[in-house]
C-alpha cells in the first residue's frame, strides 16, 4: 500500500538576513571543563595533613575560609589553589557519619590571579549524596539550558592525597564568569537565595531566614539571614525588587525579567524540582541584576530534580509529589509573594502555562532521556562501582533511573517520576486547554504576516534592546487594512518599524490559552538586521517533529485522509493531508 503527503501549506520561519537567536552556543563545547563525554580525574593534594579537620571546623566557624592545595588535571599541576568544603545537608549527612565524601568548592584564582582550570576560575564538586544515579543534576541541566541561562554539569573522579575519594558531580559556579557568558557583563548585583541556617548546626547559631521575597521592612539588615550577597553591593537593589513584588511601588516588569522567571517556574514544575521557590522549600536559586536593570532568576542545585529525596516525605503517598499543584503559591496564605503576583496576573499565568506545555512536549521524551542517562552511566559505572564512599549500592545506581525506592529514606525514580508527572500535567484542566496555532511567519519589505488559528488576540512582541529584553507589544490585525490583505482570513499583519537589529516573537491568545512562536521565546526569538523580502523555507530534514494536532489544536496520532497540523521543534507548522 502506497500513500503520499499532500502538503497544503509549507510554513517558513527563517528569511535571508533573519535567524532564530540560539543561546545554546553559549554553553560549553566538546573538550571543555563540562564536556559530557569525558570522565576526567582531578587530584587534590594538601600540604597540611590535618586538612580535613581544619576544613570541617572552618565550615562551621568561618565558611569562606580556604586552605591551599595543588590540583592536577590532565598531567598539569596548578599551585596555590583555594579549597573549602561546601553544601548544607549534603555536607552534614556524610560528615556526621565520618564519611569523607563531602562537597568541595575549588577556587583556582584565590591566590594566583588569573589562574584557571580549562578556562574556569572556580568549580564546585557535589557529592550526589541524595542521588543514587549520579545523573539527576546532569539530566536536569540538559533540560533547563533550553529555556533560560543555567549552570552546566558533568561527572569527574576525585582523588585527595592520592586516594580515590569518589565520583563527583562537577557543577558550574554562578559567578562573574557565568554572568559574563550569559549576560555579556559581570558587574551587576548578585544574590544566592539561600537562608543562612545549617542542616547540622553544632555551633548553635540562629536559624536562617527564608528567601521567599517577602517584604520585611526598609531596614536591609532584616534580609541578611535569607539572602547571601555575592557582589560588592546590592542590598538596596534587592529591596527595590521586594518592594515591587509586595507593595507595587514600580511595575514588576521594570525590575524583574518576568519571562525568565516564568520559564524557571515552568521547568521546575515539569521536571519535579520541588526543592526551590515554587516547590516545597524556598531556596536554591540566584538573582542577578543585569544592565537592563532586570533581575534574572537562575536555577541552582538540581540534585533533587525528578522528585529526588523529596520523595522521602511522600513515599507512601506519592500523589503528593507526582500531582503537586503547578499553580501552588497563587494563594497569599502560602507565603510566596512572587508566585502570588505572577500566577494571579492573567497574561503571566497564560504565559507560564504555555511554557509548561512547551517543556512537556519538548523535553519529557523518556527514550531520549534514558539514552543520555545510559551513556553517562556507562561512562561512569566503574568509577561509581569503585567509589566506596558513595551512599548507595550499584543496584540502586541502576534501578533508581527507572523507579523510586525506600532505603533509609525515599528517593524518586527518574522515569517513574516523568511518567507520573507528565500524565498528571497533560490532564490538568488548565494545561490541557487548546492554545492557538501559529504558522507561516513571513516578512515582505516592512510587512510582517503570520497565520494563526483559534486566537482572539495576536501580538508582535518586539525589542531593539542589546540585552534581548523588555519586549513591547504591538497588536497584529486581521481586518483587511493597514497592510492586511484580507479580513478574517486567519492571516494577521503588522507594519514593522524601519530600523535594524529587530528582535521579535509572536504571542497569540484565546480566552483559554496562549501560544508563542518561537515556542522558547523570550529565550529564543526571531532576529534580523535588514528586511530582505519573503522568508525562505527551512531545511525540513533538520527539524524534529514535536507533535501532530487536529484542526481543533488537540494532539492526535497520524491518520489518513484528514487535516493534520505537524508542529516542529523550530516553531514551524505544516498543514497536511496524508492520502492513502
Regions found by a protein language model. Give the residues of each.
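Exposed beta-strand face motif in extracellular beta-rich ectodomains
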Residues: 67, 500-504, 562
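C-terminal tail/sorting-segment detector
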Residues: 563-580
Amino acid at each position: 500500500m502506497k500513500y503520499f503527503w499532500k502538503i497544503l501549506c509549507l510554513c517558513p520561519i527563517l528569511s535571508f538576513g533573519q535567524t532564530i537567536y540560539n543561546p545554546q552556543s553559549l554553553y560549553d563545547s566538546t573538550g571543555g571543563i563540562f564536556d559530557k563525554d569525558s570522565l576526567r580525574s582531578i587530584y587534590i593534594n594538601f600540604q597540611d595533613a590535618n586538612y580535613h579537620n581544619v576544613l570541617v571546623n572552618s565550615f562551621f566557624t568561618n565558611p569562606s575560609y580556604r586552605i591551599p592545595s595543588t590540583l592536577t588535571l590532565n598531567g598539569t599541576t596548578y599551585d596555590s589553589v583555594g579549597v573549602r568544603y561546601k553544601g548544607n545537608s549534603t555536607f552534614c549527612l556524610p560528615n556526621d557519619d565520618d564519611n569523607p565524601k563531602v562537597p568541595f568548592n575549588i577556587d583556582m584564582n584565590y591566590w594566583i590571579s588569573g589562574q584557571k582550570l580549562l578556562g574556569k576560575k572556580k568549580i564546585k564538586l557535589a557529592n550526589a549524596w541524595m542521588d543514587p544515579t549520579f545523573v539527576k543534576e546532569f539530566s536536569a541541566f540538559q533540560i533547563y539550558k533550553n529555556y533560560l541561562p543555567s549552570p552546566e554539569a558533568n561527572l569527574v573522579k576525585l582523588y585527595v592525597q592520592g586516594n580515590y575519594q569518589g565520583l563527583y558531580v562537577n557543577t558550574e559556579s554562578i559567578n562573574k564568569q557565568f554572568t559574563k557568558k550569559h549576560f555579556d557583563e559581570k558587574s551587576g548585583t548578585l544574590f544566592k537565595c539561600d537562608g543562612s541556617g545549617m542542616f547540622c548546626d553544632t555551633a548553635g547559631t540562629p536559624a536562617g531566614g527564608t528567601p521567599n521575597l517577602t517584604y520585611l521592612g526598609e531596614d536591609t539588615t532584616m534580609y541578611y539571614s535569607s539572602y547571601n550577597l555575592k557582589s560588592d553591593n546590592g542590598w538596596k537593589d534587592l529591596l527595590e525588587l521586594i518592594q515591587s513584588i509586595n507593595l507595587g511601588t514600580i511595575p514588576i516588569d521594570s525590575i524583574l525579567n518576568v519571562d525568565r522567571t516564568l520559564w524557571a517556574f515552568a521547568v521546575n514544575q515539569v521536571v519535579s524540582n520541588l526543592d526551590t521557590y515554587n516547590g516545597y522549600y524556598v531556596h536554591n536559586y540566584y538573582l542577578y541584576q543585569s544592565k537592563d536593570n532586570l533581575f534574572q532568576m537562575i536555577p541552582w542545585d538540581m540534585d533533587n530534580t525528578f522528585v529526588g529525596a523529596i520523595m522521602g516525605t511522600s513515599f507512601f503517598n506519592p500523589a503528593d509529589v507526582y500531582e503537586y499543584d503547578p499553580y501552588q503559591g497563587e494563594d497569599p496564605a502560602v507565603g510566596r509573594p512572587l508566585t502570588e503576583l505572577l500566577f494571579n496576573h492573567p497574561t503571566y499565568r497564560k504565559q507560564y502555562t504555555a511554557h509548561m506545555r512547551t517543556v512537556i512536549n519538548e523535553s519529557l521524551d523518556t527514550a531520549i532521556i534514558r539514552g543520555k542517562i545510559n551513556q553517562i552511566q556507562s561512562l561512569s559505572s566503574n568509577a561509581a562501582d569503585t567509589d566506596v564512599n558513595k551512599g548507595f549500592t550499584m543496584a540502586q545506581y541502576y534501578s533508581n533511573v527507572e523507579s523510586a525506592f525506600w532505603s533509609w529514606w525515599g528517593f524518586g525514580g527518574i522515569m517513574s517520576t516523568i511518567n507520573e508527572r507528565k500524565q498528571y500535567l497533560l490532564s490538568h484542566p488548565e494545561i490541557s486547554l487548546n492554545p492557538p496555532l501559529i504558522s507561516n511567519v513571513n516578512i515582505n519589505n516592512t510587512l510582517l504576516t503570520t497565520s494563526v488559528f483559534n486566537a482572539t488576540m495576536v501580538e508582535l512582541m518586539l525589542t531593539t534592546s542589546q540585552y534581548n529584553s523588555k519586549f513591547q507589544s504591538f497588536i497584529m490585525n486581521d481586518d483587511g487594512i493597514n497592510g492586511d490583505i484580507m479580513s478574517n482570513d486567519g492571516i494577521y499583519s503588522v507594519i514593522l518599524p524601519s530600523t535594524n537589529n529587530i528582535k521579535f516573537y509572536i504571542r497569540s491568545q484565546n480566552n483559554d490559552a496562549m501560544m508563542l512562536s518561537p515556542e522558547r521565546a523570550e529565550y529564543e526569538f526571531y532576529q534580523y538586521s535588514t528586511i530582505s523580502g519573503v522568508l525562505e523555507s527551512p531545511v525540513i530534514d533538520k527539524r524534529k517533529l514535536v507533535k501532530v494536532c487536529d484542526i481543533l489544536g488537540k494532539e492526535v496520532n497520524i491518520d489518513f485522509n484528514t487535516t493534520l497540523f505537524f508542529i516542529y521543534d523550530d516553531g514551524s507548522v505544516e498543514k497536511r493531508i496524508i492520502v492513502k
